[in-house]
């Protein structure tokens, strides 16, 4: 077997994808025969050091979680030459799933169940003191058994972090991300709301960082919040969307973090309430009136 088919003590089974400076493979540990997902980043130039640091941060953060919705992070391997790190390999749980952008839910109840699981995973992250900061359809994997996995902790950070660079995804990015203000759990609430909107309406919401191209990856420049028109409510775009779910999404994507729901726990509770309504349509639907009144 040629060296190109191995990375350290791991044999490459398949290429799963790639990022800006990373490649992701399905691999097998040659010693234990266990199968993993491996993210590999090579430092070819000095400017690549930040991509190495990003993977190291992804390991440091991911290793602190233990939740079924968050992809498990196993270990980080540094490949050195002359005492200098030339590349890193992040060994992660191999998830057999399809991203949400490629396999949309076939029912509103199915969509709400996906949203609820994502919110549960984010609630766990917040409880450990971290924010994901890049929730979007491509970072959500759907498994055959109905489970969900949140992936890609490359933008994750401690609650309250003020980043030096604008990071996030146009079309999903909260105003505080585009304006380099403190990242908090309410940032994830906005990102989740923007993702829910896209899933149900198939359009990105108007954000302070709108996409320049159709792939939602190119920044067009940050706008002021006063220049942004509120999105049309989902149920007005798609009449199949329940008004309670539409209200939930609109609450999440408020431009001012103070106007969003108080916590991800509130989101979880509301989504459970909405699921109850969808499963029991003959019963009167409760009104969501505030952060504390979520189970009335």
Indicate where each model-derived feature is located.
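Conserved catalytic-loop aspartate of Hanks-type protein kinases
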Residues: 188
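Activation segment signature within eukaryotic-like protein kinase domains
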Residues: 114-115
């Amino acid at each position: 077997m040629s060296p190109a088919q191995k990375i350290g003590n791991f044999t490459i089974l398949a290429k799963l994808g790639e990022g800006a400076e990373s490649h992701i493979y399905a691999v097998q540990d040659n010693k234990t025969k266990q199968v993993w997902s491996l993210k590999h980043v090579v430092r070819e130039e000095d400017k690549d050091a930040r991509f190495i640091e990003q993977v190291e941060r992804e390991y440091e953060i991911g290793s602190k979680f233990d939740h079924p919705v968050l992809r498990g992070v196993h270990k980080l391997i540094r490949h050195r030459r002359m005492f200098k790190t030339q590349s890193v390999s992040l060994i992660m749980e191999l998830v057999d799933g399809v991203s949400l952008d490629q396999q949309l839910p076939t029912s509103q109840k199915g969509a709400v169940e996906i949203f609820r699981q994502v919110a549960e995973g984010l609630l766990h992250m917040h409880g450990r003191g971290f924010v994901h900061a890049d929730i979007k359809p491509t970072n959500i994997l759907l498994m055959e058994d109905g489970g969900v996995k949140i992936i890609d902790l490359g933008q994750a950070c401690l609650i309250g972090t003020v980043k030096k660079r604008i990071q996030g995804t146009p079309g999903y990015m909260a105003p505080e991300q585009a304006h380099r203000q403190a990242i908090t759990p309410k940032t994830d609430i906005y990102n989740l709301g923007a993702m829910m909107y896209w899933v149900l309406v198939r359009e990105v919401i108007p954000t302070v960082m709108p996409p320049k191209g159709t792939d939602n990856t190119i920044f067009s420049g940050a706008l002021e919040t006063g220049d942004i028109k509120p999105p049309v409510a989902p149920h007005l775009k798609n009449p199949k969307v329940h008004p309670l779910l539409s209200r939930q999404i609109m609450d999440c994507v408020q431009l001012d973090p103070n106007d969003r729901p108080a916590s991800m726990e509130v989101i979880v509770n509301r989504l459970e309430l909405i699921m109850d309504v969808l499963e029991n349509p003959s019963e009167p639907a409760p009104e969501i009136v505030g952060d504390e009144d979520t189970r009335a």
